[in-house]
Amino acid sequence: MNADLKRVRENTLDDSPSPSAKRRLNSNASSPIQPSDDEGMAEWMKIVEVKRKEAIYRQMLEYRRISEHETKRANDLEAQRRVLEASFHAVELCWTQIVAAVRDLAGAENLQLKEEEVLEPLLDPSTPVPELEKALRSRLPTTRQLVTRFVDLVAHNATRPASEADLQARCLKLEAEASALRSNSKLLESEISALKGSRDEAQRDLQRIRKALDRERMEHGKAQEEWKEERTRGGQATPNLRANGSGHSTPNGKVEADKKFYSGAGPSMAGVLQDTSELEQLAASRLKQLEQLRFEQTQLQQEVDRLKILANHPSEAALRESPFFQVYLHQLSTSINRAESLQTRFTATESKLDQLRDSNGEFREAVLAEARGQTETLRAQMAKKDSDIARLRGQRDELNSEIMERRAKEVEKCKYTEQIENLANSRQERISFLTSEVRRLKGKLAAAHSSDGYLSFLKESGIDGDYVKDLEAKVVTSQDQINALTSQLERVSSDTAAAKSETEVRTELESAKRLLARYERILGPNPEAAEDVRYLSQQLEKKEKERASLEMKLEEAEAATNALYSEVEGLSKLWEALDQTVKSKVLELRDGEQKITRLATEKAKADNKYFAAMRAKEAVDMEAKAAQRSVEKQLRLLERAQEVETSLRSQITANEKGLTALKNNALDLQNQLATVVAEKTQLELRLQQSQNALVEAQQIMHQRVAEAIAEKEARAKLQDEADGQMKIIKKLKERQDAVAAASQTGMSDHEWAITQERDKLLKLLKCSCCEQNFKQQVIVKCMHTFCKQCLEQRIASRQRKCPACGLAFAKEDIQTLYWQ
């Protein structure tokens, strides 16, 4: 985007106003256009032209985003079209199966239908809607012929089906299910419309925020270019800059050309920093809004994907609500009901023929009585099964509640374990802080007693070592070395006494040399020193000790300060973690209170429902008792009649038992075969639909993963740009602090300039790697200069490349640098 913005600005007018002129125009009085000033009008028109081009560029970005969205939408519609084509083929298959089933039940020779016309695939998804309606109208006569044939078959039979009450009950049940499905459909349609409205509103908000973000990016890029131009002009205004320590314009010894904030430059830089701070606050607020909107967009996108998958691969309930399925289902149910009624009539007719053949007029009554007995038995079994189901449901509910309770306990245990781990980590950090404090206090104590050896021991071994044992070990080592040297001298010299005396003489000579060197360093080479010189030497020696003590205290204070900084940083992190923990606990407490309130409300509702159910149950029990008494009276009468007819029933049952069993077995096998075939076809269709839904879900997943990767890369780029801008702003703030400090101390412009020049020269003399030691050695290959410690560290670590230019060097390429 920055490259595009730069191209837009380069295409503006050649004589466009400078950034400083634009700032003056923007920060002047309320009337930026002066009618009497033609030059001001021209500059204003140029600024207006630049703003217009930037607005055109932002609108082009918006058009590009809209084009990408429409392309994606077109791809989704194409995928939906393919799914609908598959649905059309499924409907064709369903129609073929219905025609085959009807033909098998009624007989193809009696129907007098042309199978080619009936099974011709007229539903082509590529044809327009009028042609589809024409195809349906062409099939309408065939359907009417089938219905007419079934009506004729019903008309030939004078008796009505015996299961008319069952059919009516089933019809009422299906109507109730249809009304429930219609209400659910309307509810889902209202939810979809609400989601569409919220999605449109979120898209409008996202479009508005994207425009604002583009505008802010362009303003930020413009401000950055203006600042760079001002910095370039400031660098050109100070040409008297010295070269670096190596004599080359390389990163080694680099000194930045600081702007002179004195003599009227301070207020402008203060204004720039103020504008920068305001822009930072605005960017932070916009970033929060963008994160919130991105989260909402992600949720809406997930919801859209879910709805899209449901639209492309609807569920069985949605398919059952479709008009084509309802038409075919109605036709199929009508055909099946008629076939069942015909089968029942056929059975009744056969029984009547048997009765007429056997001259048994009471056969029907016996059959009805037996059917009633079986019905009562089945009712008792159904009641028993209902009680068993209720008992199993109660056990299931108890087990589910127990499982939920155990899961809640496990979640609480996990939370408690996590809190214990966090507490242990904080205690560990506290121990490290206390260890640092002990080290700092020991260093302070050593500095107070001027113990340089103890300070070095603390730096090397820390607080766990024993200083006395370390000194004893050093004494033992020194004594061993002395003994070894003494024994060596004894072996070299034949006379032990002479060797011992020579050793003592050499020891005294070395001590005298050290003492003489110290006196010569203080008094000079002249051995004849006056009393004032001796006094001066004593004072110098005393001051030298004080200086060494002060340096030791200063070093210890710096180490203590660094340790305090690290402790403060760690404590701040612990405080932030504790604050987050407190906030999470407050939120958990609020959620718990809300949950308790909701459970109390639900309990009250459940109690009301329970009492209402108990009252209804009592009323039903009373009605059941009254019905039971009437049934018992009727049963007594039936038992008396059954005792008379028992002998006749036994004979009839013995004769017809075998034939009835065979017929029932044949019918059961036919029904099972038809059921298995229908289930197989239905499972195949479900498998195909599930596979299509899986493929589309995988495509959506890959698309979302690609979008997430692209967004991550763009975010990383923007983060790098923001880090660079933060470094520049930090440098500007440091310079402003330096100017403010100089103005508070009452330093004049000339003195401040001299101080800045002194700091620059001191920076030139110091090593560019560590910025602490002075430059002592030079690399002869590239002539870059560094301190001795930095080069020795690189040689020891085998990183033998110049820190400034990266040129490889050897140990022989390093020479000592002499300042003259």
Curated annotation (Swiss-Prot):
Organism: Cryptococcus neoformans var. neoformans serotype D (strain JEC21 / ATCC MYA-565) (Filobasidiella neoformans)
Gene: BRE1
Similarity remark: Belongs to the BRE1 family.
Pathway: Protein modification; protein ubiquitination
Described purpose of this protein according to its UniProt entry: E3 ubiquitin-protein ligase that mediates monoubiquitination of histone H2B to form H2BK123ub1. H2BK123ub1 gives a specific tag for epigenetic transcriptional activation and is also a prerequisite for H3K4me and H3K79me formation.
GO MF term list: ubiquitin protein ligase activity; zinc ion binding
Lineage: Eukaryota, Fungi, Dikarya, Basidiomycota, Agaricomycotina
Keyword Metal-binding found: yes
Location in the cell: Nucleus
Segments of skewed composition (Polar residues): 235-252
InterPro entries: E3_ubiquit_lig_Bre1 (IPR013956), Znf_C3HC4_RING-type (IPR018957), Znf_RING (IPR001841), Znf_RING/FYVE/PHD (IPR013083), Znf_RING_CS (IPR017907)
Alphabetized UniProt keyword annotations: Chromatin regulator, Coiled coil, Metal-binding, Nucleus, Transferase, Ubl conjugation pathway, Zinc, Zinc-finger
Name of the protein in its database record: E3 ubiquitin-protein ligase BRE1
Major subcellular location class: nucleus
UniProt xrefs under Pfam families: BRE1 (PF08647), zf-C3HC4 (PF00097)
Lineage top rank: taxon: Eukaryota
